[in-house]
């Protein structure tokens, strides 16, 4: 089965997630067996030491010893988890993938030892959470991506009982984590207390769960294609959604579009509670209001019949940046991008010898735009450009000393007189925000 899996998925380079437990140990020896049979692929192992168990160091030593004995390259990586005990599994998982992401090579695929029983447990946990088709479809047997890591789970159709039988038959040593018997963890509770009763009543329960998951994955794939078509009708940029017609669309379709739009921006599916809140408090709030919903470090805001996904940043209107050398890029604060000199930028006159280029994000002075005869406040000009209010004080304003020159990428003031025989200066603002506002 494993041989066919590797051939069918055309995997050439494998990074094995090797905990030393029975499943990853079984997978390691199966990969070794295939290598000895001259199957064309390379593999190495990674062991993540979570430092949560008194025997963590012994487990690392065991994995290292096994790999050395079989000439398997191995990386031992320690991670530190200091956080809420109620979320320890979730946090450990995230940190584990972050550590792997830093180590995995571009053409490598991560292989894990998840088996048929794990798949059933995952489905039941999704039921407990009230998940939809995405959660209930559980783990994918085929190649997919998590945290930007390509991952395969070749043992998902092999039961834990079959793995144990093979391990005992070949007298192979593995690590038994005593915490696996602690039923305060939901997965252990299901495995030890619930699933045995279900199997006693229905012996093929786990295999039927696996079949249901396969069906759900097929349906999810078709549904995903249809949702993508719907979403693309309203997507302006990944961070901007046109909601002008949402009042005339079925509420359930709107909710699905919203969920998948948020997933594009935060990589995880939002809860139905959050989607409902966005639908009621943002989309259908008063026309003249500026509603927002906060999701972690981000905000969802509405302006001019559009939803915006934007990062929260501190107030920066009092910041002044001096730019003495335009040959070098100037990095703006809070990941607002860079200002560079290039051939594609906004054309500006060179500053005079006694003038210093400085960048600000606010001015109370009225300004005069090129080809305009009336001085206006920036606030008024930004309104004319239909810029969302929260973006207006993120736009770099170029000053020569205290004289306003331009709002970079938008407009230039015509109040600055160019010195004779001076070449123009061309400046560009390189930023994802710039793509949004112009």
Curated annotation (Swiss-Prot):
Signal peptide: none annotated. InterPro entries: Lysidine-tRNA-synth_C, Rossmann-like_a/b/a_fold, TilS/TtcA_N, tRNA_Ile_lys_synt, tRNA_Ile_lys_synt_N, tRNA_Ile_lys_synt_subst-bd. SUPFAM superfamilies: Adenine nucleotide alpha hydrolases-like, MesJ substrate recognition domain-like, PheT/TilS domain. Keywords: ATP-binding, Cytoplasm, Ligase, Nucleotide-binding, tRNA processing. One of its GO terms (molecular function) is tRNA(Ile)-lysidine synthase activity. One of its GO terms (cellular component) is cytoplasm. ATP binds at residues 19-24. It is found in: Cytoplasm. SMART domains: TilS_C. One of its GO terms (biological process) is tRNA modification. Its EC number is 6.3.4.19. It catalyses: cytidine(34) in tRNA(Ile2) + L-lysine + ATP = lysidine(34) in tRNA(Ile2) + AMP + diphosphate + H(+). Ligates lysine onto the cytidine present at position 34 of the AUA codon-specific tRNA(Ile) that contains the anticodon CAU, in an ATP-dependent manner. Cytidine is converted to lysidine, thus changing the amino acid specificity of the tRNA from methionine to isoleucine. Belongs to the tRNA(Ile)-lysidine synthase family. NCBIfam families: lysidine_TilS_C (TIGR02433), lysidine_TilS_N (TIGR02432). The N-terminal region contains the highly conserved SGGXDS motif, predicted to be a P-loop motif involved in ATP binding. HAMAP family: tRNA_Ile_lys_synt. This is tRNA(Ile)-lysidine synthase.
């Amino acid at each position: 089965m494993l041989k066919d899996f590797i051939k069918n998925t055309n995997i050439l380079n494998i990074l094995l997630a090797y905990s030393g437990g029975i499943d990853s140990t079984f997978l390691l020896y199966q990969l070794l067996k295939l290598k000895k049979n001259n199957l064309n692929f390379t593999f190495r192992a990674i062991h993540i030491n979570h430092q949560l168990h008194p025997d963590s160091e012994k487990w690392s030593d065991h994995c290292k010893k096994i790999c050395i004995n079989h000439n398997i390259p191995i990386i031992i990586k320690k991670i530190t988890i200091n956080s809420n005990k109620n979320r320890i599994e979730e946090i450990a998982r995230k940190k584990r993938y972050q550590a792997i992401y830093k180590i995995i090579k571009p053409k490598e695929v991560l292989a894990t030892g998840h088996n048929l029983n794990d798949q059933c447990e995952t489905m039941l946990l999704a039921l407990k959470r009230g998940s939809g088709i995405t959660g209930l479809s559980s783990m994918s047997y085929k190649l997919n991506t998590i945290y930007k890591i390509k991952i395969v789970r070749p043992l998902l159709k092999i039961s834990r009982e079959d793995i144990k039988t093979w391990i005992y038959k070949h007298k192979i040593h593995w690590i038994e984590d005593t915490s696996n018997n602690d039923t305060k963890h939901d997965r252990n509770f299901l495995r030890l207390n619930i699933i045995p009763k279900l199997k006693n009543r229905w012996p093929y329960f786990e295999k039927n769960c696996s079949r249901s998951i396969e069906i759900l994955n097929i349906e999810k794939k078709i549904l995903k294609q249809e949702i993508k078509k719907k979403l693309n009708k309203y997507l302006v940029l990944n961070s901007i959604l046109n909601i002008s017609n949402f009042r005339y669309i079925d509420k359930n379709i709107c909710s699905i579009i919203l969920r998948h739009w948020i997933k594009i921006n935060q990589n995880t599916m939002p809860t139905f509670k959050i989607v409902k809140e966005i639908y009621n408090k943002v989309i259908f709030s008063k026309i003249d209001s500026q509603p927002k919903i906060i999701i972690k470090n981000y905000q969802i805001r509405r302006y001019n019949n559009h939803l915006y996904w934007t990062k929260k940043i501190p107030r920066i209107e009092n910041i002044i940046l001096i730019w003495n050398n335009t040959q070098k890029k100037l990095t703006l604060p809070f990941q607002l991008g860079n200002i560079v000199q290039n051939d594609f930028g906004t054309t500006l006159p060179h500053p005079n010898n006694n003038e210093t280029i400085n960048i600000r994000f606010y001015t109370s002075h009225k300004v005069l735009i090129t080809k305009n005869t009336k001085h206006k406040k920036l606030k008024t000009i930004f309104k004319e450009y239909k810029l969302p209010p929260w973006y207006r004080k993120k736009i770099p304003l170029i000053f020569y000393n205290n004289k306003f020159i331009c709002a970079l990428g938008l407009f230039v003031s015509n109040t600055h007189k160019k010195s004779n025989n001076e070449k123009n200066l061309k400046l560009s603002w390189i930023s994802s925000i710039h793509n949004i506002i112009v």
